């Protein structure tokens, strides 16, 4: 038997209670069950560096919708949650926290610093878990992981050793992003590029043996000390005769060659560029092609070094810039200085300008490892949704460079490389060896560096299932099915997971990558601290409930596209939850303790058949859209059905048989049975999107069932397909809308009933419409809905409404009181006459037109136009009424 709902829906009163019930009953938990097909996804682990933002809310809502959907379809659905140690991000946060306490990180020491960082992790990982629970995510908390937990650390060490032994990992010198403040290498993902105002300094480079010179424009004159060549385009006729000659390097006693390289854009600037291989990634590649020396002019803190700095040694890079520009000008090398805006890379954590430098680091050779990941897209083992991201993925993989995996920080997986204290031999393995294989020494020092965060994250789909051990979980749940993530980390994470999956398990880690966009503010701007436009999802949940936030994030959402966040949409989503609640409450109040039976003679009940048929089609459409990852489209179909067809139409149509059950108990039973069945199916379809409100309603509607989230997903059934009844009710809706429009246009109150005549030659349609006559009386304020084949007996002055396959007539005398309406319209005519005169007076006043703001003048013109249109309608209506009166 159904139970009644509270009068109003209060999210705060039910969300925590329901989530606790779900967890206590282990509804989110999955174990190996060979009788079921698994569906697995892993949560992109949020960093432990703070609170969740709106992007996390979107990402996890999408995942939760999919996992709830698959669970209801009968899959053994596993969603693995976890957090990322976020190496450098966390280290910066903890370092700053220590600074506020007056503690220096280096004085504290590595071990004590790591203790503090683990404390940070415990605090913030718990905060993130609590926030995710408030969102309603149904991940398996019994399997929660951390990228530095024992199992993940074991996998990381195993992979490093394996790749090293196979020759893929090596230590070498290459150009990398370097942070002079944090004193560590950085990935491209950790570098933010922003447009900054700067200058082009045009400098003379004298050509040796001539009186001529090359004019070079640079935004970084301080790197001149590291120049080892001037490059020009091979096809540039201006410079063909000087390729191979030497230039004098200003401010030094060195000479550098002029080389030809296709890297140069001959249309940009002077067509000649300085090459500084140790301080620019593009120059580094040019240098490799031409065997140029690599001169590093900077120390780790971005001061100029002693070896190549000369008089500028010890200066900060910007201090050196000023000094060098002054010397260039004094010595006649500076041609001109031109303002120029250009992109500058800064560390996303400490906001220091990043310095490209050649450093000895640990790298992964990528060319061979990338090949299976490329082939996966081409042979269909892996796909992106939307498909357009296939090209982006392939472009990055086909142009991939060796991957720098070492970081000069303490928080992270320490590199398992050990150096012999006697001879320097490098040994990579599980712990330090007993003795050096080269010299026999028994003393070793472990490499100080840690691994890049993404190195461990790349193993996430299989390390979380027990790899490198061949566990039952790994055998059953891996490969996973879908990865949900943003397009901004395809290169930094997705690609690395794919090649890691092939390298270590022989399989792609997932078969589908479902890409979503960014959540932007209402103006389309990226949410950021600097703009102050971030929106805290927890504040939205606190005010409107989790379901309202989830629905807002899905409204209009399309795979791969950015979305704008509007507070108005949150209110609309909350209103929808209230609408569903109130409709459900009405239904349950009328169900009471009635024993309902599946109705017989359904063909005699077009309204019941129509809504069952519409609901059946909805099940099919939603399922198809869910399977195509068109989650936003699926939600819009559910919304339209529940708000419009079910609440606004069917419930209103069902009221007559419910309220007149004594006259026709069979019709009342049919209406109530249909209401309950359609509500049950609708709640199931809506549940993945709005789990809390649907679960609460369902638990009261069918208290004998265990839980909505554990119920079966609805399926399309041919027996509930009623195209004839759909056609009848579609016509009925047009008739009701037409009558309502006429009543509104003529200002007829609902208290004034009328008779509507429907002239319809189609017998089947007419018969069906006749069965809906009682419903029409309430929905269109009618005395009666009369169906006939011709116009006989209908007054000549009746208002006609043309609808498909029929015409509706409303006798005018039943709609209005002529005297009363003429009096009302006469008063309206007088009012409009005054308004038109007032408006004309203002617009004919030259002072108003010339001195008032343009917007104010235009506003008055718009008012006048509206008044004139209204006056024309009033006059036309008055003339018509007076003519009928006479």
Q: For each predicted feature, which ranges?
A:
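Feature 926 captures the class I aminoacyl-tRNA synthetase adenylation module centered on the KMSKS loop
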Residues: 202, 395-455, 459, 503-546, ...
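Short, solvent-exposed turn/loop segments enriched in Gly/Ser/Thr/Pro and often Arg
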Residues: 34-36, 44-45, 78-91, 144-152, ...
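Residue patterns forming the tRNA-binding/recognition surfaces of aminoacyl-tRNA synthetases
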Residues: 3, 17, 21-25, 95-214, ...
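Alpha-helical support elements that line or immediately flank enzyme active sites
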Residues: 56-58, 281-286, 496-505, 638
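Non-catalytic terminal extensions that flank enzyme cores
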Residues: 1-54, 77, 335, 348, ...
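N-terminal catalytic cores of NTP/NDP-binding nucleotidyl/phosphoryl-transfer enzymes
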Residues: 31-94, 147, 156, 216-219, ...
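Secondary-structure transition/capping motifs at alpha-helix termini
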Residues: 68-76, 97-110, 130, 134-139, ...
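Active-site-adjacent "gating/activation" loops or surface patches in catalytic cores
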Residues: 253-259, 448-478, 644, 648-651
């Amino acid at each position: 038997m159904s139970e009644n709902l509270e009068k109003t829906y209060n999210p705060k009163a039910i969300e925590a209670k329901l989530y606790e019930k779900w967890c206590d009953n282990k509804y989110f938990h999955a174990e190996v069950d060979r009788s079921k097909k698994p569906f697995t996804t892993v949560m992109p682990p949020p960093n432990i560096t703070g609170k969740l933002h709106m992007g996390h809310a979107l990402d996890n809502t999408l995942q939760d919708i999919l996992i709830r959907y698959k669970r209801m379809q009968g899959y053994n659905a596993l969603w693995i949650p976890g957090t990322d140690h976020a190496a450098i991000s966390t280290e910066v946060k903890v370092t700053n926290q220590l600074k506020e306490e007056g503690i220096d990180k280096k004085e504290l020491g590595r071990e004590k610093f790591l203790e503090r960082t683990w404390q940070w992790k415990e605090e913030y990982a718990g905060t993130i878990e609590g926030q995710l629970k408030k969102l309603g995510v149904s991940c398996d908390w019994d399997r929660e992981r951390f990228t530095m937990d024992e199992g993940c650390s074991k996998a990381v060490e195993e992979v490093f050793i394996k790749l090293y032994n196979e020759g893929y990992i090596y230590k070498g010198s290459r150009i990398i992003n370097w942070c002079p403040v944090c004193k560590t290498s950085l990935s491209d993902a950790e570098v933010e590029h922003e447009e900054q105002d700067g200058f082009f300094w045009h400098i003379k480079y004298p050509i040796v043996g001539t009186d001529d010179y090359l004019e070079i424009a640079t935004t970084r004159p301080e790197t001149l000390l590291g120049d080892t060549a001037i490059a020009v385009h091979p096809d540039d006729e201006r410079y063909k005769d000087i390729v191979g000659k030497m230039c004098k390097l200003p401010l030094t006693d060195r000479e550098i060659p002029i080389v030809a390289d296709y890297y140069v854009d001959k249309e940009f600037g002077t067509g000649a560029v300085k090459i500084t291989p140790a301080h620019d990634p593009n120059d580094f590649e040019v240098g490799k092609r031409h065997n140029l020396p690599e001169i590093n002019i900077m120390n780790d803190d971005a001061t100029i070094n002693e070896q190549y700095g000369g008089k500028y040694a010890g200066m900060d890079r910007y201090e050196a810039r000023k000094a060098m520009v002054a010397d260039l000008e004094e010595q006649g090398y500076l041609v001109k200085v031109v303002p120029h805006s250009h992109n500058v890379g800064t560390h996303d954590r400490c906001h220091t300008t990043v310095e490209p430098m050649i450093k000895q680091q640990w790298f992964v050779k990528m060319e061979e490892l990338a090949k299976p990941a490329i082939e996966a897209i081409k042979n269909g083992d892996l796909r992106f949704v939307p498909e357009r991201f296939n090209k982006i993925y392939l472009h990055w993989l086909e142009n991939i460079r060796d991957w720098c995996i070492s970081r000069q920080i303490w928080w992270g997986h320490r590199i398992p490389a050990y150096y012999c204290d006697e001879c320097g031999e490098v040994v990579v393995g599980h712990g330090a060896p007993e003795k050096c294989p080269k010299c026999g020494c028994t003393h070793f020092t472990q490499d100080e560096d840690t691994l890049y965060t993404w190195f461990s994250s790349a193993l996430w789909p299989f390390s979380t299932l027990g790899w490198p051990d061949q566990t039952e979980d790994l055998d059953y749940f891996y490969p996973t099915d879908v990865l949900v993530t943003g397009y901004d980390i395809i290169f930094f994470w997705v690609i690395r997971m794919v090649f890691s999956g092939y390298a270590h398990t022989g399989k792609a880690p997932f078969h589908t990558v479902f890409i979503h966009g960014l959540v932007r503010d209402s103006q389309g701007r990226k949410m950021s601290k600097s703009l102050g436009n971030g929106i805290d999802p927890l504040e939205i949940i606190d005010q409107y409930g989790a379901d309202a936030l989830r629905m807002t994030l899905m409204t209009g959402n399309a795979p791969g596209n950015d979305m704008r966040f509007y507070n108005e949409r949150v209110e609309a989503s909350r209103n929808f939850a209230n609408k569903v609640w109130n409709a459900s409450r009405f239904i349950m109040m009328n169900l009471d303790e009635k024993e309902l039976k599946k109705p017989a003679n359904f063909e005699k009940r077009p309204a019941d058949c129509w809504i069952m048929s519409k609901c059946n089609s909805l099940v099919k459409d939603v399922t198809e859209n869910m399977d195509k990852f068109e989650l936003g489209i699926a939600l819009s179909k559910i919304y339209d059905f529940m708000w419009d067809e079910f609440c606004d139409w069917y419930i209103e149509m069902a009221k007559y048989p419910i309220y007149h059950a004594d006259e026709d108990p069979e019709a009342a039973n049919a209406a109530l049975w249909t209401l309950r069945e359609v509500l049950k199916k609708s709640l199931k379809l809506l549940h993945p999107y709005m789990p809390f409100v649907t679960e609460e309603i369902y638990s009261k509607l069918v208290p004998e069932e265990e839980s909505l989230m554990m119920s079966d997903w609805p399926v399309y059934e041919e027996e509930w397909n009623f195209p004839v009844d759909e056609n009848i009710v579609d016509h009925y809706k047009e008739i009701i809308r037409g009558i309502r429009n006429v009543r509104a246009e003529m200002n007829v109150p609902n208290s004034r009933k009328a008779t509507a005549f429907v002239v319809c030659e189609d017998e089947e349609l007419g018969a069906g419409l006749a069965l809906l006559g009682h419903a029409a009386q309430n929905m269109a304020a009618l005395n009666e809905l009369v169906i006939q084949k011709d116009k006989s007996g209908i007054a000549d002055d009746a208002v006609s409404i043309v609808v498909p396959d029929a015409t509706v007539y409303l006798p005018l005398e039943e709609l209005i009181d002529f005297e009363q309406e003429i009096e009302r319209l006469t008063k309206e005519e007088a009012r409009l006459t005054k308004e038109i005169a007032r408006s004309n007076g203002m617009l004919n006043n030259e002072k108003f037109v010339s001195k008032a703001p343009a917007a104010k003048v235009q506003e008055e013109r718009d008012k006048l136009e509206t008044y004139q249109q209204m006056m024309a309608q009033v006059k036309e209506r008055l003339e018509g009424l007076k003519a009928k009166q006479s």
